[in-house]
Every structure is written in C-alpha cells, then in structure tokens.
Amino acid sequence: MTTGTMNVEVRPISARAAAIAITGDVTSASEAPLMDAYARATADGAKVVILDLGGLDYMNSGGIGLLVTLLVRVQREGRRLMAIGLSDHYRQILALTRLDEAIGIHDTEAEALAAAGL
C-alpha cells in the first residue's frame, strides 16, 4: 500500500511474529496506513511486530509521535514492538526521545527474533 511518499509491506515471519517494512517518509499523514499495516500484521495473533526501517528516508516529529501512538497500542494489547535497519541518525533520535528504551532496536531480523525468544 502506498500513501504519499510512504510504502508499507506486511510479512508474516511465524505464528508469533510479523514484520512491517516501511520505506519512504513517515509523518503524521502516515497514521492510517501504518495502523492498518499493524492490524494486518497482528490479525493472526502475532505477539511480536518488527518494524523494518531500512528503507526509511525521512521521519519528522509527527512520525515520532506516530511511533509513540503505535507503541501505546502495542503495549496495551500485550505485544512487543521491535525495530531493525535503523540508520545511525534515526538510532540517535530514538535514543534522544528514549523510545529505544521501549522499542527493541536491533541490526537484523534474526537478532530481533532472538531477543524476543523466538
């Protein structure tokens, strides 16, 4: 699904995990497609959602706010949110906002799955 300059693709990994690959720009305008992707990723009961941000070009404060909104939803539903593929720039932003304390940040999908015990 493409919206503006953001593209999301949902991919099941296992019965307990799914990935959402995000490419392009994440802004507040990305909320509907990202939340729809999350709903599709968890529809079959996945407890771990991995955001693949390797194709992220740009994220503004609205995009950071959207990650917070997603994180609250994930935690409320008893799931875990992880992220992979972050550039050094976006790793630093997540550290400055302390989102890295709530979102598991890993280099690869395999590392994220291992950290989740899958």
Where is each model-derived feature located?
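Short beta-strand/loop segment at the start of cytosolic alpha/beta domains
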Residues: 1-21
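Short acidic-hydrophobic, aromatic-tinged amphipathic segments that line or gate anion-handling sites
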Residues: 104-108
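Conserved catalytic submotifs in the C-terminal HATPase_c
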Residues: 14-15, 54, 110
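Residues at or immediately preceding the N-termini of alpha-helices
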Residues: 31, 109-110
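Amphipathic alpha-helical interaction surfaces in cytosolic regulatory modules
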Residues: 25-103
